[in-house]
């Protein structure tokens, strides 16, 4: 699957004194299998952007092309959903249900997406809404509950008695059970303890390794550095930079100019470089330790 975003803009409270341009002429292409971060200061347009990816919002101007295989056709022909986004005649997006099945969104307060009386029913709701049989939906509920790190005995529990972190996992399992091609996450680690953060990010890594696209909106640039390969940076509604994650996060001047705090690891690496110690690109503490050991070993050998 592929999403092609071309010059989209969006205005909240259009034609009122409170009108706010939340997106301004933004374009990008997101491909199947990518692991992408979306960063920017508060109010930069990140959440508004992701709400366009599965047609929850329709831009004032611009187009979004969703390209995916149409399994209802007998041939291998691909189905191209090309929406010319003009509010004057688009009351709703054609094929919106198809789009939303393929692009699952987990919002910041995912626990508010829970509403059924048991966890099993809650996870089953999405697949059943898209025509999956009851038996298959039950199998998916068990499969994805375990995938998010919760035991099968939770299936019969009432989700409202769970902790905040557990509710978030249940909400994630419900989206995964739809089996989307793209998984879009808005601040997925907010409010979690360090172990919970690691666990949930490991889940996203495994999903990505299985060929799914993972798009993560977050303020935690340390996690962005370690987990993602590509980063989109928003400021005042504009997509101002789209490049490799390491390239962007290594540019401390750029981050400061855009009110973003450099990852602690990058700050340390930059200080090493100021002292004449240059290492290969590192994205985690473990990789930093390896590169430092190599540097010290080489330095020792050169002094012998």
Curated annotation (Swiss-Prot):
EC number: 7.-.-.-
Lipid bilayer topology: Peripheral membrane protein
Subcellular location: Cell membrane
Gene3D superfamilies in the record: P-loop containing nucleotide triphosphate hydrolases
Domain (ABC transporter): residue spans on this chain: 3-261
GO cellular component term, pick one: ATP-binding cassette (ABC) transporter complex
Keywords per UniProt: ATP-binding, Cell membrane, Membrane, Nucleotide-binding, Translocase, Transport
Cross-referenced CDD domains: ABC_cobalt_CbiO_domain1
PROSITE patterns assigned: ABC_TRANSPORTER_1 (PS00211), ABC_TRANSPORTER_2 (PS50893), CBIO (PS51246)
Domain of life assignment: Bacteria
Positions annotated to bind ATP: 40-47
SUPFAM superfamilies per record: P-loop containing nucleoside triphosphate hydrolases
Enzyme class: translocase
A Pfam family recorded for this sequence: ABC_tran
Gene Ontology molecular function: any one: ATPase-coupled transmembrane transporter activity
Similarity remark: Belongs to the ABC transporter superfamily. Energy-coupling factor EcfA family.
Function: ATP-binding (A) component of a common energy-coupling factor (ECF) ABC-transporter complex. Unlike classic ABC transporters this ECF transporter provides the energy necessary to transport a number of different substrates.
Quaternary structure and interacting proteins, as annotated: Forms a stable energy-coupling factor (ECF) transporter complex composed of 2 membrane-embedded substrate-binding proteins (S component), 2 ATP-binding proteins (A component) and 2 transmembrane proteins (T component).
Protein's name according to its UniProt entry: Energy-coupling factor transporter ATP-binding protein EcfA2
Upper taxonomic lineage: Bacteria, Bacillati, Mycoplasmatota, Mycoplasmoidales, Metamycoplasmataceae
